[in-house]
Protein backbone atom coordinates (compact mmCIF):
# COMPACT_ATOMS: atom_id res chain seq x y z
CA UNK A 1 0.00 0.00 0.00
CA UNK A 2 1.20 3.49 -0.88
CA UNK A 3 -0.07 7.01 -0.34
CA UNK A 4 -1.22 8.36 -3.71
CA UNK A 5 -2.63 11.72 -4.73
CA UNK A 6 -6.43 11.36 -4.95
CA UNK A 7 -7.38 14.95 -5.74
CA UNK A 8 -6.25 18.53 -5.56
CA UNK A 9 -7.64 22.02 -5.87
CA UNK A 10 -5.11 23.76 -8.11
CA UNK A 11 -4.16 27.44 -7.83
CA UNK A 12 -6.89 28.59 -5.44
CA UNK A 13 -6.54 31.97 -3.74
CA UNK A 14 -6.73 32.32 0.03
CA UNK A 15 -9.67 34.66 0.67
CA UNK A 16 -9.28 34.90 4.45
CA UNK A 17 -6.88 34.05 7.27
CA UNK A 18 -8.16 33.84 10.85
CA UNK A 19 -5.49 33.22 13.48
CA UNK A 20 -8.12 33.23 16.24
CA UNK A 21 -10.01 30.22 14.88
CA UNK A 22 -9.25 26.81 16.40
CA UNK A 23 -7.50 25.45 13.30
CA UNK A 24 -8.13 23.97 9.85
CA UNK A 25 -8.85 25.21 6.33
CA UNK A 26 -12.36 26.33 5.42
CA UNK A 27 -13.25 25.41 1.82
CA UNK A 28 -16.35 26.23 -0.24
CA UNK A 29 -18.63 23.14 -0.07
CA UNK A 30 -18.84 22.93 -3.86
CA UNK A 31 -15.07 22.51 -4.08
CA UNK A 32 -15.08 20.01 -1.20
CA UNK A 33 -17.64 17.90 -3.10
CA UNK A 34 -15.90 18.14 -6.48
CA UNK A 35 -12.52 17.24 -4.96
CA UNK A 36 -14.04 14.34 -3.05
CA UNK A 37 -12.77 15.65 0.28
CA UNK A 38 -14.56 14.83 3.52
CA UNK A 39 -15.11 17.33 6.31
CA UNK A 40 -12.40 16.56 8.85
CA UNK A 41 -10.08 14.99 6.26
CA UNK A 42 -6.36 15.71 6.55
CA UNK A 43 -5.03 17.67 3.57
CA UNK A 44 -1.66 19.02 2.49
CA UNK A 45 -1.70 22.72 1.64
CA UNK A 46 1.15 24.22 -0.42
CA UNK A 47 1.63 27.93 -1.07
CA UNK A 48 2.73 28.68 -4.63
CA UNK A 49 3.47 32.20 -3.38
CA UNK A 50 5.98 31.36 -0.62
CA UNK A 51 6.67 27.64 -0.93
CA UNK A 52 5.28 26.99 2.57
CA UNK A 53 3.68 23.58 3.17
CA UNK A 54 1.45 22.41 5.99
CA UNK A 55 -1.03 19.73 6.94
CA UNK A 56 -4.43 20.60 8.36
CA UNK A 57 -8.01 19.37 8.11
CA UNK A 58 -11.01 20.45 6.05
CA UNK A 59 -14.05 22.28 7.38
CA UNK A 60 -17.16 23.22 5.44
CA UNK A 61 -17.55 26.68 3.90
CA UNK A 62 -20.61 28.27 2.34
CA UNK A 63 -21.42 26.70 -1.05
CA UNK A 64 -20.59 28.91 -4.07
CA UNK A 65 -18.88 31.49 -1.83
CA UNK A 66 -15.36 30.87 -3.15
CA UNK A 67 -14.16 30.76 0.45
CA UNK A 68 -10.69 29.42 1.13
CA UNK A 69 -9.78 30.43 4.69
CA UNK A 70 -6.65 29.44 6.58
CA UNK A 71 -7.49 29.11 10.27
CA UNK A 72 -5.55 29.04 13.52
CA UNK A 73 -1.78 28.59 13.43
CA UNK A 74 -1.93 27.85 9.68
CA UNK A 75 -2.97 31.50 9.15
CA UNK A 76 0.51 32.54 10.35
CA UNK A 77 2.11 30.39 7.65
CA UNK A 78 -0.21 30.93 4.65
CA UNK A 79 -1.87 34.33 4.39
CA UNK A 80 -4.78 36.00 2.59
CA UNK A 81 -4.04 36.52 -1.10
CA UNK A 82 -1.60 33.63 -1.48
CA UNK A 83 -2.07 31.12 -4.29
CA UNK A 84 -2.31 27.57 -2.95
CA UNK A 85 -2.79 23.93 -3.87
CA UNK A 86 -4.89 21.75 -1.54
CA UNK A 87 -4.18 18.02 -1.87
CA UNK A 88 -5.91 14.91 -0.56
CA UNK A 89 -4.30 11.48 -0.57
CA UNK A 90 -5.48 7.89 -0.49
CA UNK A 91 -3.80 4.69 0.66
CA UNK A 92 -4.00 2.25 -2.26
CA UNK A 93 -2.17 -0.71 -3.72
CA UNK A 94 -2.75 0.25 -7.36
CA UNK A 95 -2.43 3.50 -9.30
CA UNK A 96 -5.35 5.91 -9.25
CA UNK A 97 -6.16 8.80 -11.57
CA UNK A 98 -6.26 11.95 -9.43
CA UNK A 99 -8.93 14.62 -9.85
CA UNK A 100 -7.29 17.99 -10.47
CA UNK A 101 -9.78 20.82 -9.99
CA UNK A 102 -9.24 24.10 -11.79
CA UNK A 103 -10.65 27.32 -10.35
CA UNK A 104 -10.80 30.93 -11.47
CA UNK A 105 -9.59 33.97 -9.49
CA UNK A 106 -12.79 33.86 -7.38
CA UNK A 107 -12.24 30.15 -6.58
CA UNK A 108 -15.16 29.11 -8.77
CA UNK A 109 -14.85 25.63 -10.27
CA UNK A 110 -14.02 25.84 -14.00
CA UNK A 111 -13.28 22.18 -14.78
CA UNK A 112 -10.87 19.31 -14.31
CA UNK A 113 -7.36 19.15 -15.75
What is each stretch, according to the model?
Residues 8-10:
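Short structural boundary motif marking the start of a folded domain
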Residues 2-4, 14-94, 105-106:
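Compact, glycine-rich, soluble single-domain proteins
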Residues 93-94, 99-113:
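Helix-rich terminal scaffold detector
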Amino acid sequence: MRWLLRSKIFKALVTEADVNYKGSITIDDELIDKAGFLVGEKVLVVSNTTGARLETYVISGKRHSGTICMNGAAAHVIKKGEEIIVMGFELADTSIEPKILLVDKQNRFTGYL
